[in-house]
Amino acid sequence: MKSASNPSEAFESASKAEIIDRIQQLVPPGSPEPQDPEILATLQTLTAQLIKAYQADGQLESEPFNDVRDRTIYLYASAVKSKIRGKTILITGGEGCVGSFLIEKLLELGATKIISADKARCQNPAEKFPLFNREGAVTFYATDIRNFEALKHIFEVEKPAIVFHLAAQRQPGLAEIQIRETVTTSLLGTQNVIQLCEEYGAENCVFSSTGKTSRYFTTEVYAASKKMAEWQFAKAAQQGNATYGMVRFTHMLENSLFCEQMSKKAEQGKTVNVHAPHRYVTAQNLIEAVHLLLNSLVVSIPGKLKFVAVRNLGWPTETLEVALYKILESGKNLPIYFQGLLPGYEEPFFLGQFDWSKPTDIHLLINVLEDPFRIVDDAGDMVSAELAPFSLRVLDKQVSNLESLIRNPDYPEVQIKHALVAAAKEVIASSFAWSSAEDLLKILHSGINPKKLQGYGTEIADYTEIIELLLQGIYGRLNQEVLNSAGVTADEFDDLVESLSTVDSIQAEVGYLRSVSKYLREVVPAAQFTQKKSEAVAVRDAA
């Protein structure tokens, strides 16, 4: 850390960026929490000035998530009531934040028999669920879904017709520490739920996932394990007898780790730590979450996995703004500092996730390959889509390999993470093989635009693994028609190739792209491709 100096005069009229830069100079990201009184005093002054700078821009007038807290989505209550009438309903993770609220809503809608299976068995269900006023309406089991026999006992005794599968690790940061537990819960726990739904004739099963799975590729344990679970459900929907549905949640306000942490620091008068400036989250509330879960019962169809999400998530909210509001609300003169990104939150955003040619139509939880399946419900509040196609054979092989590794108690946790990421990569590669070359080229082109990356503070090398996967999917499939369909001109294609040439690990693929460019410019007249459809030209060996 650098020594402090009085910034009051120099930064009285400074911009946000200048003040943030000064804070980071004083306490570089990655440093421990500052303890030096002089540095803390300077941080207090800088934080107060940053609050004024935000206020000057019309911010911090109200709680940043106010609009999210007041939102709701239409609940197809009549259809849901009809669906659950007389049915036994099982909720894994029933004593978590969402599970608890779901139980209350189901009771309100007339459910007469609800089963909760949760590792953390609650001690006072009557107090936790005030609507629990009918003898025997809710039964609580202390069960880890990874324990097949324990879960089987519940299915054997209770015979649930409807299952909501919510049990999972909820903290991305903790997932990077408790790797084995996170992966086994997502992989083995999900497999147990699906298998028992089929064996005991469940009618419907709804899975709660995360918007982080809209990333094509991820090395984060939390998101990668959820992607594997999504693929398991997609397979079950195609091959099983039950009807499967899925919900993608984003940041849950009532269950927000960073909001809780910031509020506690402000209440205690302590230094408030923020991961980094310019970090944004999209959020939703519990009412939206539970309505999505219940509506999924209504919109799910046999033989296909449809996932639902809130249609209008609003503008993303900056976490720094939330921290400053918490301090302002406390009435205390508290300092902030930027601790740096932690494992589970480090992955940079990949611009190719969305189709930027239609910026007003982007949905933050649906990627380019899922977007063609997007449908808005009749009420206009909810959107549904489907996963991009992938190889079931590849999934089976990767799940089998992963299961054999994670069942070995001596297998190192860090190796479990590597195996998880490698497995997800294989399934993603199979999905890209199904995808059109036009879509993959469009994703690649928009994903590594140097000027845009500079604005995000990232560089092409930060996306090496997803670039490798995209190039693998494109290899041998490019021609002029593909470039035209992707909206990529010959000059833009050449610029793309030059940008990619800076990545050492893909030089063979860059050589292929150069061959394509040369072939299309010198061998095939451009007019030929605008007058008639052409066959894909494999030019792997073109000089």
What is each model feature region?
Residues R85-K87, A202, L305:
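Phosphate-coordination loops involved in phosphoryl transfer and adenosine-cofactor binding
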Residues T92, A117, V163-Q169, C205-G211, ...:
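SDR active-site strand-loop-helix element
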Residues A142-T184, Y216:
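NAD(P)H-binding glycine-rich loop region in Rossmannoid oxidoreductase-like domains
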Residues H165, I177-R180, T184, L188-K227, ...:
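Conserved Rossmann-fold NAD(P)-dependent oxidoreductase catalytic core, especially the SDR/UDP-sugar
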